[in-house]
Structure formats: C-alpha cells, structure tokens
A protein has these predicted regions:
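Short active-site segment of divalent metal-dependent hydrolases/proteases
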Residues: 35, 106, 285
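Catalytic histidine-centered segment of alpha/beta-hydrolase-like enzymes
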Residues: 280-289, 293
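Short, flexible hinge/linker loops that cap or flank conserved catalytic cores
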Residues: 9, 21-23, 48, 238-242
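Short acidic-hydrophobic surface loop/beta-edge motif
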Residues: 3-10
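Active-site helix-initiating loop/hinge in glycosyltransferases
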Residues: 33, 75, 287-288
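Conserved HGGG/HGGXW glycine-rich cap/lid loop of the alpha/beta-hydrolase fold
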Residues: 18-67
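A short loop-to-beta-strand scaffold at the N-terminal edge of the catalytic core in hydrolase folds
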Residues: 11-19
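Flexible "cap/lid" subdomain of the alpha/beta-hydrolase fold that forms the substrate-access gate
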Residues: 2, 15, 55, 62-101, ...
Length: 302
C-alpha cells in the first residue's frame, strides 16, 4: 500500500513523497526524472516495501513539492541538499541508504550525490541517466548525441512551459508515444493507459516551470556554436569518480540517450555492474518494472 506525506525540510523546501514499508526498516530512496513524478516508482515501492522503507519524493519543482521560480534554485547543489535533508528525516538514526535508485534527472542528482556524499549510501542504482563525464564528452563531440539532446535547448526557452501545456499538453505526449508507450504490440508498450495519462495531467497541471528550470540551470546541453561555454567545460576526475558499488541499468532503445553514453563508464566507477536491456526505451521503469526490480534485488544481495 502506498502512503503519501509531506517532508518539510529545514532549509525551507517541502517535498511531497510517496512511501511504502515499515518505518525503522533500512531505506531505499527513489528519484524520478522529467517529465515524470514520484508515482512512476509505485510498483517498486510495493515490491520492496515488504522488507525496506521505500521513499520516493517528488523532486523540487514537481507535483506538490516546493517549486522556486528562479532557475538558479535548481542547480545540483540545491537538489543534493534536498536529498541529504530527506535522508536525515527518513533514515533511522541517519543510517546510510541501502540504495539510492534514480532515473533521468533523478540520476543526474544521484551521480553527484554518490560522489560528494558517499557516506550516505551503500550502493547506487542508475536507470538511463548519463554519467556527467560521458555526457559531457558526447555533447561536445558526438553529432548523434547533440541531435538527440536538441530538445534541451527548446526547454530552456522562456516560453517553454506555456508551449508544453498548450492543447492538453500536445507537445508532451510524444515524449512517450514516440517510444511506443501507447503501442501494446511492442514489448513493454501500451503502458500509457487512460489512468496513467490522468496521473500525468495532474502532475503537469501543477506546473511545468520547475521541470524546465532543471534544464535552464544545467551547463550540460548541446552547443549551438563552437564558442558555447560547454566546449570549454571539463570535469576533474575527483568530481566524477563514484566509489560506491554501482548498478547501471541501460535501456538500449532510448532515443534521447544513445548507448554511446555508457562507453568508457568503467573509468569513472571502479565497482560497476552494467546491465544492458535490448529493446527497452527511456521509459523502462514503466515498461519493465519487474526487470528493474529484479536487477535491484541482485544489487542488494551482492
């Protein structure tokens, strides 16, 4: 059974959360991406809730969580502060998480969190979220990735949220349907049911500025000229090396995040287990929750 609560954090942010499992049990924390919300983890919360306290916050800017208007409030350091404060609230005695599980933008936060706060988690699980070093490499050098990520520059437009909300979110649905979400003949397809559409309408109707601000605040987006700041950006190894055991689940038919993003990943993650999933798309959590749960089970047992 899924419960909901409001986590009021000491630095003035409130996160609306979904949870399952007994209070006092070891904690699994799940971070969603864009344009999703905490509800995408419900099947995993119920699966693991028999043994763990499972918590999935709506990140700042999503659903009923605090949604600051200024893009600067969505820099990773602020998002990490939310996660750290939430862990202090939900983890008994401040014990480290059994696992931090994250997808898409949640993964962008989780990569940095694992590097900078390794004492707060025992293991990291990433689902189709590019490591910052390989993402930077591909954005700078790979025309395929530059084209696949071109939407990021659109989402930085000052009118992006108005355009996305127009005509019953007409520009939003193709993010899902272009990867087979409404096609029951496709493996894992057909998950975008009328009920799920209503869940998304409710989330998006609460506001899209927060979600767009993640892109506005990020230095990682495709260059539009050779002089763009990203072309001069470099990451020192100590800022991108993950020292906790890490599972990366990578759906190979992700049209926004091609598999080239996992090439060379082992250079940044000494304790890496990589699971490639042919035929699955960016929305693998919707498509194949049993597979995702099974791989997380293996990681927890290791």
């Amino acid at each position: 059974m899924i419960e909901t609560f409001q986590a009021v954090l000491p630095h003035g942010i409130t996160l609306s959360c979904r949870a399952s499992g007994p209070a006092g049990a070891p904690v699994l924390l799940f971070l969603h991406g864009f344009p999703e919300a905490a509800f995408v983890w419900d099947e995993l919360l119920e699966h693991f809730g028999t043994r763990y306290r499972c918590v999935a916050p709506n990140l700042r800017g999503f659903e009923q969580s605090s949604s600051p208007k200024e893009p600067e409030a969505y820099r990773v350091k602020h998002l990490m502060a939310d996660v750290e404060a939430l862990i202090a609230q939900v983890s008994p005695g401040g014990a480290p998480l059994e696992a931090l599980v994250a997808h898409d933008w949640g993964g962008a936060v989780a990569w940095s969190f694992a590097v900078q706060r390794p004492q707060l988690l025992k293991r990291l699980v990433i689902v189709n979220s590019p490591h910052p070093a390989t993402f930077l490499r591909e954005l700078k050098n790979n025309p395929v990735q530059q084209a696949a990520s071109a939407y990021m520059n659109f989402l930085c437009r000052p009118d992006a949220e108005a355009l996305l909300a127009a005509d019953d979110f007409r520009r939003m649905w193709p993010m899902f349907t272009n990867m087979g979400a409404a096609d029951p003949a496709r493996k894992g397809g057909g998950w975008l049911t009328p009920q799920v559409r209503e869940q998304y309408r409710a989330v998006w109707g609460a506001g899209l500025t927060g979600g767009c601000n993640y892109y506005r605040a990020s230095p990682l987006r495709p260059p539009t000229s050779p002089d763009d700041a990203i072309m001069k950006l470099e990451f020192a190894p100590e800022f991108v090396t993950v020292k906790v055991p890490t599972l990366v689940i990578w759906a190979e038919e992700d049209s926004a995040l091609p598999p080239s993003l996992i090439d060379g990943l082992e250079a940044y993650i000494p304790a890496l287990r990589l699971v490639r999933v042919p035929g699955a798309t960016h929305w693998i959590v919707h498509e194949q929750p049993e597979l995702v749960a099974g791989e997380i089970e293996r990681a927890l047992a290791a």
